[in-house]
Amino acid sequence: MIGKRFFQTTSKKIAFAFDIDGVLFRGKKPIAGASDALKLLNRNKIPYILLTNGGGFSERARTEFISSKLDVDVSPLQIIQSHTPYKSLVNKYSRILAVGTPSVRGVAEGYGFQDVVHQTDIVRYNRDIAPFSGLSDEQVMEYSRDIPDLTTKKFDAVLVFNDPHDWAADIQIISDAINSENGMLNTLRNEKSGKPSIPIYFSNQDLLWANPYKLNRFGQGAFRLLVRRLYLELNGEPLQDYTLGKPTKLTYDFAHHVLIDWEKRLSGKIGQSVKQKLPLLGTKPSTSPFHAVFMVGDNPASDIIGAQNYGWNSCLVKTGVYNEGDDLKECKPTLIVNDVFDAVTKTLEKYA
């Protein structure tokens, strides 16, 4: 199978989208068959992208790590992390509060945001703002910057990039921002409303994710639930927020654009050096060259439901969140397979 060649006709062209955690990797360790699966697709010039609700690093750093570990060439133009669609917001907001691990400041600046404040900058400014922060003074000084106009320039939006590590402080700081007077630090608006003072975006809503521990762990979806619950208590109305990542249509539309762009590069229709054109958030491709796209994932609630709702096929693997016998409820994967290599080979045998 590894050496077999597959030929696609113009009218029967297929493509793949792969989750990363629980499909290609478990933690930082590659899952058996992941390398062979991608090599098989590369050899046959079958287009694929990586579509993950993970994040915290630049697309280049993430694909360099994946390429190194799997011994396969993966381009930064092939990956959509949970926060990759934030690139489309660069011209919309001036100052943003970038919430997540310390690395997300660099990610946001790499996207082109001109004025990025990290939540640790606010802890540094006044530790009484976050009395239950778990960060030491040394950590705060390492992660943060001194922002001279922190109290005189308003925030335009809150963008949660990945799962933050200091939830007590981060929830407090986010709550302050979305209940402030027009995005100004140290203020509290008079009215109560479901609409936050400034827009807030969460890059995914995964309640659980799979790491090397045998039981699934809470993810950004759990963090979002806490923010939303506290907002409801303070305002008496549900928070009107924006959520990206799988299974949202916003992210699948964005991913579809990226997949079409990669197919054009792979087939020589555009050069590899041509800058990737970013779609506007919420815009569906007008046409698609694919007869079918297969989403390979381990999480029924994000990968499979997202693909199903979007009109893509799906392959559910047993190497991550999903365990055989779990109640799939409304999920209807096209295939349930052991692992990613199984997903690719069975799909190609049946559809290519």
UniProtKB/Swiss-Prot annotation:
Other facts: Present with 3870 molecules/cell in log phase SD medium.
Alphabetical list of InterPro entries matching this protein: CDP-alcohol_PTase-I (IPR050324), HAD-like_sf (IPR036412), HAD-SF_hydro_IIA (IPR006357), HAD-SF_hydro_IIA_CECR5 (IPR006353), HAD_sf (IPR023214)
Gene Ontology process terms (BP): glycerophospholipid biosynthetic process
Protein name: Mitochondrial hydrolase YKR070W
Main location (coarse class): mitochondrion
Subcellular location: Mitochondrion
The family this protein is said to belong to: Belongs to the HAD-like hydrolase superfamily.
GO molecular function: hydrolase activity
UniProt cross-references to CDD domains, sorted A to Z: HAD_like
Family matches, as PANTHER family: CDP-DIACYLGLYCEROL--GLYCEROL-3-PHOSPHATE 3-PHOSPHATIDYLTRANSFERASE-RELATED, SUPERFAMILY HYDROLASE, PUTATIVE (AFU_ORTHOLOGUE AFUA_2G02580)-RELATED
UniProt entry keywords in alphabetical sequence: Hydrolase, Mitochondrion
One Pfam family it belongs to: Hydrolase_6
EC number assigned by the record: 3.-.-.-
One GO cellular component term: mitochondrion
EC class (word): hydrolase
